[in-house]
Amino acid sequence: MRILIKGAGVAGLTAALELTRRGLAVTVFDTAPQIGRGASWFAGGMLAPWCERESAEQAVLDLGQSALDWWEEATPGLVTRNGTLVVAPARDREELSRFASRTSGYRLVDEDEIARLEPDLAGRFRHGLFFEGEGHLDPRLAMAALHRRLLESGVVFHLGGAAIDEGSFDRIVDCTGHAQVGSLSGLRGVRGEMLYLATHEVSLSRPVRLLHPRIPLYIVPREPGRFMLGATMIETEEAGPISARSMMEFLNAAYALHPSFGEAQIIESGTGIRPAFPDNLPRIVQEDKTLFINGAHRHGFLLSPAMARLAADFIEHKEVSHADPRQRRSA
């Protein structure tokens, strides 16, 4: 069976690997000249199913728990399993209690344990939540590793060229994200913004989430001395540079986490349009011989492995798990 995958972001690359593992001939097509230059390029890369349950449905936890093992096998050496630390300023202690009430898989940590986990945060926060079973990766390195692995497996890539002849393929798997807004019923775009900061005055070993009733922040360590900041979710499909308000909120929150971030260099800013359905859960939608994998919202790296597996099961006509959003939430 010959499969055409449209879209070379995280959804398309994970689907390509899953289908290749099952012995299918896979071709990946993208109008962009390089892989992963859409929303995937600006992702945080947090493999945090328990934390994400705070604002997501149970399906995100159910589908996301296998992500760490999948990425660890698919991209050896790129997954860091140091957990996630969640903290809040003393004045926002209620936010920490609220977060705890909506999640599981954590243990309460006091000031001493916060200092043990993250020495540079010593004395800054009295209470926190530690989600020991979570991890993170660098999305850009992970996608590059998947690309290399797929090339070695014989996957053909058509990047940046004219439209490909779809008639010669038995199945088409469309992973083009927000490009399907207006075509897939209920799909919308949600703008996400991010910053990269550079400083050697602060060191973090894991993603840290700083809770605030208006400006929640996550900060994810990359290579030494570099940090990715994110968390904006703006209900618009308008692309373009990061807004002044978002940048100020990011920097204020980073400064609240540690004052040394006030002297950091801003080395990159960016925005991505995340595809989302009304319930913010991904779906698998069939139209003739095309299977759409879409709607991962802010959970692309967390949920794409599970969605790829479910889509491959469907293509092979296997029984699909009841956790499959396609069964419960078809478009």
Identify the meaning behind each predicted range:
Residues 129-167, 171, 175:
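Helical element adjacent to the flavin cofactor pocket in flavoenzyme catalytic cores
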Residues 55-65, 87-94, 129-145, 241-246:
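Short beta-strand to alpha-helix junction loop
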